[in-house]
Amino acid sequence: MGIIAWIIFGLIAGIIAKLIMPGRDGGGFFLTCILGIVGAVVGGWLATMFGIGGSISGFNLHSFLVAVVGAILVLGVFRLLQRE
């Protein structure tokens, strides 16, 4: 899937990741969107690299779930790094 689609998915996935993992992360909505975009791109890259579920392309449920999982992972890593 193109990078533009991952960015769009990332914006939405970042919001959903924040709803799933609420907390005070600092940076507010802007940081949530950035982490979501990074997470979606990382999730898409990892899913493609490991061949999880075939090809990740287009706007479909599988691609969206990969974006949300990636955003949750990036948010978790961000929180771990923020504690140190």
From Swiss-Prot:
InterPro entries: Transgly_assoc (IPR007341). It holds the Pfam family Transgly_assoc. Its main location: membrane. One of its GO terms (cellular component) is plasma membrane. It is found in: Cell inner membrane. It is a multi-pass membrane protein. It comes from the Bacteria. The chain crosses the membrane at residues 1-21, 27-47, 58-78. Keywords: Cell inner membrane, Cell membrane, Membrane, Transmembrane, Transmembrane helix. Coiled coil: none annotated. Belongs to the UPF0410 family. This is UPF0410 protein YmgE. The gene is ymgE.
